[in-house]
Every structure is written in C-alpha cells, then in structure tokens.
Amino acid sequence: IPSSLVGSEMCIRDRATVVSTDHTGPAGQETLDLEALCRDMGVPVVIGNCVTYDVALQLMRAGAAGVMVGIGPGAACTSRGVLGVGIPQATAVADCAAARADYEKESGRYVPIVADGGIVTGGDICKCIACGADAVMIGSPIARAEEAPGRGFHWGMATPSPVLPRGTRINVGNTGSIERILRGPAKLDDGTHNLLGCLKTSMGTLGAQTIKEMQQVEVVVAPSLLTEGKVYQKAQHLGMGK
C-alpha cells in the first residue's frame, strides 16, 4: 500500500473485502498515514505486525479493523537473527490481547487480533487462542499440502528482499492434502494433521464452547508439559519425541 490511496483503487475495484498493510516498505515514499488509510479505504484494514501492548493500542486507535501479531517466530523467518527484534509469540499475543481489552473499554469497539507465525501444530493454534488471539495465520502447515504451489518448499514474504532478506527458503515436504491437514482424518501423530479437530477437541477438553470462552481458560508456563512421561516417544523418535 503506497502513502497515498491511489495505488489501492484497483483493490477496491476488484471487490477486495480486506486490505492489509502487512510487510510494507517505504521505498522512498512518504510515511504512510495509517489513520487516514483506515478512514478513507472503504474496506476493513488489517495492520501488522506488532508484538507489544503499546503498539497494538496505537494501531487500534488508528482505526485498524484487525491487528496482526508476531515478529520472527515463523518457520522460514530470520528477522530475529537479522534485526535482533522479536518477542516470544505467546507473550506477544497475550500483551496485544490486553491492549485490545483496554481499547474496547476505552472506545466500545472490539478489534480482533491474529497470531501470525510460529504455528506448526494444532496445539500451537490452541495456545494462541488461549492467550487471546481471535484467529491465526499459518504458512508452513499449509505449505506442506499436496496442493500448495511451493511443491514442498516454504519461504517468508521478506525472503526475496534485494536489500535485506529476513527469511529463507525451507523444505517442509508434502504430508497430505489440504483437507487432511485442516480437517483430517489425520495420518500423522504429531498434531500437524486435522488442525481444526485439534482445536475442537482442546476446546471440548477445557469446557470452552466458543472462541471467547477459549480465550478465558487458565494459561500456565510449563516447559515439562511436552516431555513429562514421554521417555519412550523421545527414545524412539515418535509422536511428541520427534
């Protein structure tokens, strides 16, 4: 999206339902006026990415219809090494969710947040929702689909930058159809198949009937959760021991 709205007219003409400012670069242009963009665009504008309470609150006050959360956790992203910038995704989502709650009290407007990056398994999706996300954006899990145009490879949006690449091209392979990855039935035991089934089962286990209720479940930091009692899986490189 350029600093003016001229270049975005084509998007509106082609009936775009959402416009995102994700991964914009100045390229010698004037600073983008986010408030004017959100006000004048005519369609919902999703802004990102951010990882802190203060920035998320500023974006919401600028008129964002949604906020993307995550810097560096993506499977192909190298931003944390290149820029030294980033916050663990669970913390980032929780902090931005706190900003959303305060902004809703302030304005009466609820702004959805989308966890973007670091999501590989159904468990990752569940944890993002539990930390406060309304939705997730996934790359590498979908790149593993037989229908994906990358044919088993995945790369981030900043990877091909001619000035400062902040990503790499990784081989994620093909593990099944998009239907199997999203809805099952799963043929893998590591949580990378039937992602929606993972979320539904987790919500049922926690007694959450809606996403809103899932956002209210208790969250604890428990590193041993992934290793406790998994001696045989770890030794045999199965399931959670891979």
Model-predicted regions and their roles:
Residues 18-41, 53-60, 74-94, 149-152:
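Active-site-adjacent beta->alpha loops and helix N-cap segments on the catalytic face
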Residues 17-19, 45-48, 67-69, 113-116, ...:
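Hydrophobic faces of well-ordered beta-strands that scaffold small-molecule active sites
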Residues 1-7, 12:
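Single conserved hydrophobic/aromatic residue that forms the stacking wall/gate
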Residues 41-42, 55, 62, 84-115, ...:
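Alpha/beta catalytic cores of nucleotide-metabolism and tRNA/nucleoside-modifying enzymes
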Residues 3-4, 38, 106:
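Generic structural signal for beta-strand residues in well-ordered domains
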Residues 13-15, 21-24, 50-52, 71-74, ...:
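Short, ordered loop/turn segments at secondary-structure junctions
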Residues 2, 47, 202-205:
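Short N-terminal micro-motifs specific to bacterial/archaeal maturation
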Residues 1, 78-81, 138:
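Glycine-rich, flexible loop/turn motifs
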